[in-house]
């Protein structure tokens, strides 16, 4: 029990000391400096005025902010139990690597004479672009699919914005985004290791992806703040500014259906959801139908589950009473898609929890996947049984019996 408490406290403190996390102390200090500098340049505000706006008690100790702090504490405990049971990106990367071996009947070696830094640059850029595009797709789905909105709504009920608002998420949304990161990283790692081998490296600064480091150090934490900073009409067509994300959090639903991107604005431009920042910030943040219990922690965790069940149930009952057999409305379609997404997430979670052993068939040389196997075993504690050789399929069937997917 004592070890669990120490581990929990370590997880709570880690985001402030880890450059891979948004609220790393260095990024928070950088955000203050950016806010002071740009506020003076763009609007002539003094350092004292900007600091007063940044650290106003009415923002940092509001009901909304206090709920954020509670959610951080609760979600951390929840995710400590869930994350080790999710499918590993190393396992998925290994599966993809082996699958590509079969597709290509061997492993090509692309650009054998290319400098290592070129391969590292291409890999880092590809991973960043894929990750950012996936964030846009998932974020837009959370808004467009009513079932998923039941959970994402928790984030948008924030009426005051602080850097900790980024963690104001329901655990179901947390699992969805965790799986998104796992799949995207596994895709990039598997493909690049297949084509470029051990030349695949990530360009980092202080251990963080170089692109995300620059994003965070240049004021990413101001996205969830009351400091209005616009990049101008030209730059905002390429990068999402803090002001654009604050527009996304506006209480006006027309604003909330825009600027779904995380870093790059190109996805919103392609999807028709880009909105440039205007001269004035939104009048208020949150959602229009906020209730007195909006910032109650029990309500934050329970209400989305109730609403999700209702979201699934109501279209079905309406269909029986009113709709012809062949008529499905758009809301039902979206809820069905959302249900499938949730089913996949829970299925992956359930499979990971139930799997004490992982059985892998490989007709390739052991050294090709052994590093992935060892890393996966060290990270998850899962025992891995690997069958090598051409007759491995028969051995696999014999070992796994009737439960074998083969």
Features from the language model and the residues they span:
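Early extracytoplasmic/lumenal segment of secretory-pathway proteins
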Residues: 355-406
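Specific transmembrane helices
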Residues: 23-105, 123-135
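A membrane-cytosol interface segment of integral membrane proteins
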Residues: 206, 281-322
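A transmembrane-helix-recognition feature enriched in membrane-embedded lipid enzymes
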Residues: 65, 72, 262-270, 301-315
């Amino acid at each position: 029990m004592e070890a669990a408490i120490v581990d929990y406290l370590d997880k709570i403190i880690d985001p402030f000391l880890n450059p891979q996390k948004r609220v790393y102390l260095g990024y928070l200090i950088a955000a203050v400096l950016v806010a002071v500098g740009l506020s003076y340049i763009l609007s002539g505000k003094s350092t004292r005025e900007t600091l007063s706006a940044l650290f106003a008690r009415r923002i940092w100790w509001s009901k909304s902010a206090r709920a954020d702090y509670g959610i951080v504490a609760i979600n951390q405990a929840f995710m400590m139990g869930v994350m080790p049971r999710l499918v590993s990106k190393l396992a998925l990367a290994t599966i993809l690597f082996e699958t590509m071996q079969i597709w290509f009947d061997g492993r090509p070696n692309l650009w054998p004479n290319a400098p290592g830094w070129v391969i590292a640059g291409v890999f880092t850029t590809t991973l960043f672009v894929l990750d950012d595009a996936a964030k846009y797709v998932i974020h837009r789905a959370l808004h467009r699919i009513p079932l998923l909105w039941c959970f994402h709504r928790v984030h948008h009920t924030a009426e005051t914005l602080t850097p900790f608002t980024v963690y104001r998420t329901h655990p179901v949304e947390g699992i969805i985004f965790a799986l998104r990161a796992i799949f995207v990283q596994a895709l990039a790692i598997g493909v690049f290791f297949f084509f470029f081998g051990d030349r695949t490296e990530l360009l980092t600064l202080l251990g963080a992806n170089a692109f995300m480091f620059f994003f965070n150090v240049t004021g990413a934490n101001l996205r969830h703040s009351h400091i209005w900073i616009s990049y101008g009409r030209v730059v905002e067509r390429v990068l999402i500014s803090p002001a654009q994300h604050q527009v996304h959090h506006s209480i006006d639903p027309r604003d909330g259906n825009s600027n779904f991107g995380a870093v790059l604005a190109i996805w919103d431009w392609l999807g028709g959801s880009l909105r440039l920042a205007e001269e004035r910030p939104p009048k208020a943040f949150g959602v229009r139908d906020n209730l007195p219990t909006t910032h109650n922690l029990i309500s934050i965790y329970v209400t989305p589950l109730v609403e999700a069940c209702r979201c699934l149930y109501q279209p079905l009952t309406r269909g029986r009473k009113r709709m012809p057999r062949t008529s499905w409305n758009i809301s039902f379609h979206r809820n069905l898609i959302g249900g499938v997404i949730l089913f996949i997430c829970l299925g992956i979670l359930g499979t990971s929890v139930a799997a004490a052993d992982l059985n892998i068939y490989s007709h390739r040389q052991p050294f090709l996947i052994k590093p992935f196997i060892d890393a996966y075993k060290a990270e998850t504690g899962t025992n891995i049984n690997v069958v090598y050789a051409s007759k491995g399929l028969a051995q696999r069937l014999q070992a796994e019996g009737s439960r074998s997917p083969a």
